[in-house]
């Protein structure tokens, strides 16, 4: 596999998954096409893509739930499916089905017992996790899971994914179905895990959340990785200035501002030229600066543009 200066916790090389369908199994669906990527220790990595892009298939392949048709993958230095690795990773599925007659506390005890965590450790670990994910301890002891809201279920799901204190955590659509407050709280949990040095790999189609918390991202569409990198690498550095000016003459401002237009009693546009020179020239134009901000394309704009270039839409 690829050598890097930073330690990698996850690597894939030409990973491919093909399903056979039809009565005679003579039709092929390529769910993953030669996916190659690296996730480094301690980073938060976001996998983006429209519905049906293959995000969950890739994640389940990495977890050993789905067997790849071809290609290779390493997790924590071992081949996917290695039993010793399973003790060191956590997983939150998108659509989790828990035994809902258990209380939240009993459920976490069950998961802890699967990992053979001693009772003495459980007594300390479970309250810590409940505090981390924002679930009341008494509620977790008394209330059955079938009485939990969507947000509470997501929190208990995150807690079970962390019960074994994993080095690498997989989240499948952790913000799915949550209201803005719930999404904010899950983002805060992920940021807390990041500060603890955990490596986080998650799927999402909520681009604003990914943009706020990820160190690097990958865009997956129709099973193919279209790009992998940091936001600066993918979107480019923010070296374009958006300017808003009050007053001044249009013919003079046009020499400095590209796409000059009048809106809400101000001139708006994109600065061409050096900011210092523009600021020095403002007084001679009898104009006053309202704002001058660095700007770049949003992740959403980039995402839609990449899909359109390839004739793809989010509904496909």
Task: Outline where the language-model segments fall.
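Sequence-level motif detector for i,i+2 pairs with an aromatic at +2
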Residues: 5-7, 42, 238, 264
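ABC-family P-loop ATPase nucleotide-binding domain
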Residues: 1-18, 25-28, 309-316
């Amino acid at each position: 596999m690829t050598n890097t200066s930073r330690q990698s916790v996850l690597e894939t090389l030409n990973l491919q998954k093909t399903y056979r369908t039809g009565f005679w199994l003579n039709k092929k669906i390529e769910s993953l096409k030669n996916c190659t990527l690296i996730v480094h220790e301690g980073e938060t990595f976001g996998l983006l893509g429209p519905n049906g892009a293959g995000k969950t298939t890739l994640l389940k392949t990495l977890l050993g739930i789905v067997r790849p048709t071809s290609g290779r993958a390493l997790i924590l230095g071992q081949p996917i499916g290695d039993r010793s690795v399973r003790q060191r990773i956590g997983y939150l599925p998108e659509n989790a089905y828990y035994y809902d007659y258990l209380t939240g506390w009993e459920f976490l005890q069950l998961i802890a017992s699967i990992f053979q965590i001693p009772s003495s450790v459980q007594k300390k670990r479970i309250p810590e996790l409940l505090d981390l994910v924002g679930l009341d301890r008494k509620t977790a002891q008394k209330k059955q899971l079938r009485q939990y809201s969507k947000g509470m279920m997501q929190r208990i799901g995150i807690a079970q994914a962390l019960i074994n204190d994993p080095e690498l955590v997989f989240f499948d659509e952790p913000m799915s179905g949550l209201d803005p407050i719930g999404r904010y709280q899950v983002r805060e949990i992920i940021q807390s895990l990041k500060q603890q040095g955990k490596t986080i790999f998650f799927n999402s189609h909520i681009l604003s959340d990914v943009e706020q918390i990820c160190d690097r991202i990958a865009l997956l569409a129709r099973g193919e990785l279209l790009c992998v990198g940091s936001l600066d690498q993918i979107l480019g550095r923010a070296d374009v200035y958006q300017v808003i000016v009050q007053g001044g003459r249009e013919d003079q401002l046009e020499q400095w501002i590209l796409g000059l237009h009048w809106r809400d009693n101000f001139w708006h546009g994109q600065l061409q030229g050096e900011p210092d020179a523009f600021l020095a020239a403002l007084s001679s134009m009898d104009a006053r600066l309202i704002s001058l901000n660095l700007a770049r394309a949003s992740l959403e704009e980039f995402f839609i543009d990449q899909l359109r270039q390839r004739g793809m839409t989010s509904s496909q």
